[in-house]
Amino acid sequence: MGVWGRRGGVVAGVLVAGVAVTGCGSVDVAGAPVEREVFAFQGRELVVDSVGSDLVVGAGDVEDVRVERQVDGWGVGGSGPEARWELVDGRLRIRVECDGIASGCGAVHRVLVPRDVAVSVTGEDGDVAVEGFATAVKVRSDNGDVRVSKVSGALDIGSDNGDVRAEDGLGSGEVVVRSDNGDVRLSFGVVPRRVDVAGDNGDLTVTLPRAEYEVSGSSGNGDRNIDVPVREGSGRKVSLRSDNGDVTVRTAN
């Protein structure tokens, strides 16, 4: 069933953070109570803005926005973890904060969105996973990995510090990825029209179905490996640029 269960329910235990903190305490998000909230929503695009939590965003057969969270933590000389969520004017705002002289927090939020809604996701200090959208998806991540699966709408990803993975039969016709620090791996299940990937520090790998592509690949400090049929003027354009890392374009078979 993947990240999301039948009837639009959210499957617990997916992308759960569990952080051990030596000497003072431990964080057990998987064992934390599950809290649930349903937010009324009408619109064509949902903005998800998360700080301090891992995040799973998926599309389902629902008419509203459904959120589950698990939060755990500890604090010395403070209040421990404080979690807040609200949906106002099309923006779902998620915050998890630790307060204290010494503290440790961990959290995961799972967000279920109507299938016909596009999403724009911003994650800070946490991993981001997005699954199951046929609509446009935009992801911005600051300090966390990004994982995308079963997405067929236009895809736009920006990552400041973390790996980017879209390897489960990516169906998007147009994909743009910008990465400051981390590897990027894209694996397509359909022939895309446009792929544009640029990275400052990390390997870039794109796996494509067999077809002819117009390919541009360059690296300031790394190997360049182009192993797909290449034809100038093809309507299918692939561009990879890395300042410091290998650049690879290859066929799936």
Task: Tell where the protein language model's regions lie, with residue ranges.
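Short, surface-exposed charged micro-motifs
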Residues: 47, 56, 82-84, 110, ...
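Right-handed parallel beta-helix
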Residues: 35-39, 80-153, 164-166, 185-187, ...
